[in-house]
Amino acid sequence: NLYNMGLLEPAGEILHDLGFSLESLCALEPDAGLGNGGLGRLASCYMDAATGLNYPVTGFSIRYEFGIFRQKIVDGWQMEFPDNWLEMGDVWLHTRKDDAVEVRFGGQVHEWMDGDKFKTAQTGYQSVIAVPHELYISGYGSKAVNKLTLWSASMPQSFDMNAFSRGDYVRALEQNTMAEAISKVLYPADDHINGKRLRLRQQYLLVSSSLQ
């Protein structure tokens, strides 16, 4: 953003006067393992190019808590560790809890005619709340500022007090844990049925919340 708005040099001079360097501050920000694949790079190029050309666009994705795993060699073996890109905070993201939407999973859809009106109702579903986090993108040489909306998932009620009071501590947090798993990890393993279901839930949450 500093580069796009022509503020890179002034920012560097101000930081120098304060005893810091822009390079050292930039080095502190972790390189998140998000969107590093071909499609991710292509999507970011679309956003950058459209904003630079003054087109009003909005991008959508999921606010993953962990990116692609980090790799380390330990005693000659490859080890995988979570990429906790949010451990230093998310100062670039603006959380909009008031704009959260409900996404319904599962259940049954009932259809009936009420006179000449066709009506539907969904029952037995699991409700998940999608909260938007907005990242603003400035255009190079343009006056446009567009946004990338990232969705995080949680339950409407994150704590089951009745289950906790019965001593069922795991169940008291189970539903919220299952909901938060949707936005937990980028590219979860899908070589088993639970992984396939999780990826489908991720895709459904992204489409439903973005359309809403």
Model-derived segments and spans:
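A conserved ligand/cofactor-binding region detector
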Residues: 1-212
